[in-house]
Amino acid sequence: MYRWVFICNVVTNNYTTMNIFYLHRDPYKAAEYQYNKHVVKMILESAQMLCTAHHEIMGDDADVPYKRAHVNHPSTIWARQNKNHYRWLFNHMVALGHEYTARYGKTHLSINKCFLPLYRYPVGMPDGAFEQPPQCMPDEYKDDCSIKAYWNYYIGEKHIVAGKNEKIYEKIDMEAL
């Protein structure tokens, strides 16, 4: 357990590492809430985590567009733990792709490259119950509920990612999530 927390804390000190912005339990709504910078960035990161799941589970038999990436990152580990995690992240990647197209009028390259290869689970991936994604953020934002923690993080660190013309989240009605 200590190693998991240590890894999570280390990677969150660098805002360019992988993450899953779990802003709503519905992967499509979670994508809608994301700032433009994350919509652009998180499609590739989600695709990398899903491709890594294929590589880690299927080994040399994996036929996916991207190489392994951040194999030991808590979010990448979470994505490959079971089919429910994988499916949530896949649906979230697709939803981010829809958001990208709606906001920028074009299709993200990772959607073109990865949709079909990642549509199917890696052969041998176990079933399992859905658990909230890990909270990879500074400790000050963490909460028992990952959705609340990610909103704490999103509101607290908005100056890092919000564009000049974007709606800035100051608070959120947690009951609506």
Q: Which role does the model predict for each range below?
A:
Residues W4-N72, T76-L177:
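Sequence termini and other peripheral, non-core segments
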